[in-house]
Every structure is written in C-alpha cells, then in structure tokens.
Amino acid sequence: MSLYPEIEPYDHGMLDVGDGNHVYWETCGNPHGKPAVVLHGGPGSRASPGLRRYFDPAAYRIVLLDQRGAGRSLPRASAPDTDMSVNTTAHLMADLERLRVHLGIERWLVWGVSWGSVLGLRYAQTHPGVVTELVLTGVATGSNAEVALLTRGLGNIFPEAHERFLAELPPDARDGNLPAAYNRLLESPDPAVRERAARAWTDWETATIPAPPGSVARYQDPDFRMGFARTVTHYWGNDHFLGDGNDEGVVIRDAHLLKGIPGTLVQGSLDFGNLLGIVWRLHHAWPDSDLVIVDEAGHDAGTTGDEALLAATDKYARGGTAE
C-alpha cells in the first residue's frame, strides 16, 4: 500500500487567532468529505505537503495548519522580537477550536505526528466532543520523563554527540533544566550566540532521532533552524505547558478523558525519541485505542508504518470498519 497521490489545496488562508498571531491553514481533498485535521511535529516544524497523502482525497476534507510561530504562520518564532509567552499548548488548542469554527466543522478526526500526537491527545482530552478519532504516529505524551530521556538519557547511547551538546552551555547550566538553559541562549540579544545555540540543538536532534533526508535538510535553513530550536526549548523547558503533575505524565494520567474516542497508535520499536514503553502505557490506559508496533523502525516508522497509518484513515473513512 503506497501513499495517496500528491494533491494541492483547494482553499487556504491566514486566520487571526489573537495576540498578534495569524495561523496559516489549508484544505485539501473532498470539500464534502469526512473532516480531518493534521498536527505537525516539533513543536516548531510545519505542515509539509507529504502529510496530505495519508488520507483518501475522495473521502476526506483534509485540514492542515502551521502552528503558532511555525512555517507560514506569523509572526515567526525565528524573529527575536516574537512574543513566545503567547505560544503555549493552551494557545494552540484554542487556535484549533477557532479554526474548526471558522471552517464550519462540527467534529473532526485528529491526526498527529510526534509533538502533534501530544497536542492531539491533550486537545481530545480537553475537547472530547469535537474529536471523532485519533491517528497518531511517533507517539509522545510530553512528560518531563520523556524530556529527560531526550536531553540526558540518550547521552548514554550517543556520548560523543551529548558531550558536544552540553559544551555549548555555561558549565553552571549543565546540571539543570537543559532545554531552559538552551532557551536562554536562544533569547540572547547577540545573534551569534543565538545561531550557535540553534545549530547545537538541531545537531543533537539529528544525532539522536534519525529522520528522512528531507527532514534533516531543513535544519540547514537558518530561519527554520532558529524557529524550531526556539520553540522546542520553550515548550520542553516549561513542561510542555501541561501543568502540575507532568513529571510522570499528565496525558497518561488523564487518559480516561479519551473514553469513547477510537484511536490508532503507530510506533517504531526502535524509536529513541519516544520509547515504546510510554506508548504501551498510554495504550493500556486508553482501552479504545489500537497499538501497531513496527519492528526495527525508528521515529519515522517507514513503509510499514505508512501502511498502518493508511489502513487507519481508510478504516475511519468507512465508519471504523475493517475491509
């Protein structure tokens, strides 16, 4: 099973979501089809055209957006004067609700990758009445334990890269909240300091979470690199803005709020970025979910993962029934 053919949007726009922010959105596929919204990763990445291809364009009304500060949304997080205090998980969920209402959609399927899975899960827990299904891959829950693994624990597997990662920080900042320490550098008034920090952060990302060549190439764009690093460290350094109790994971703690929402979780067994054990616990706390484990696959679950994602969206387009 291959991805659906490339398609172009039939409509797009910039939605004023307040706080001086305008969010880019686009719609593809069938204007009268089953609504689905796609949540990209990062935080701070963008909605790439390839994400349109996980849905049957004859069956779905596919909505994509660039989250605050990312991609084509304005202002960009890469601009040093962009106010990041109005870029939080609560703001992003409110933006989704504004967009849903703007497009006249009553309920929609939520499809998320990596950080998009965290946002999608929390959105569904907060607004369960508007979510028909969840399809998630490269699944994370945004817990502090996951951030500690990504910024410290993986140093046991990639010691040389981790040494370089720590070397960019002042010595007195290497034992504390590493994302917050990097974020302070990325907020520096000195452009050279900001650029070194952005490059060091994305170098660590590419060393530990292998991705398709196209995804790695984007880090060579200074504007993308800066916006991505600034946004990720802003979220990771602030507990993903998920509130108290996130050391062990607010999303799994509140999994009961997903009751009645069908979901499909697709995870590579060798995903160092989001360990399978986290997804396993989420799956068992959410009885309405199906878990597809892709053997010997990483954060990008590859062709087998794509097949599972396509099977999920095809199934939900048929009302949740298998072929």
From Swiss-Prot:
Q: Which residue intervals define the domain AB hydrolase-1 in the entry?
A: 37-301
GO MF = aminopeptidase activity
- Top-rank taxon, per record: Bacteria
Q: Which GO terms describe its biological process?
A: proteolysis
Q: Which residues of this protein are catalytic?
A: 114 (nucleophile), 271, 299 (proton donor)
- The reply to whether Protease figures as a keyword in the UniProt entry is yes
Q: Which GO terms describe its cellular component?
A: cytoplasm
Protein name per the record? Probable proline iminopeptidase
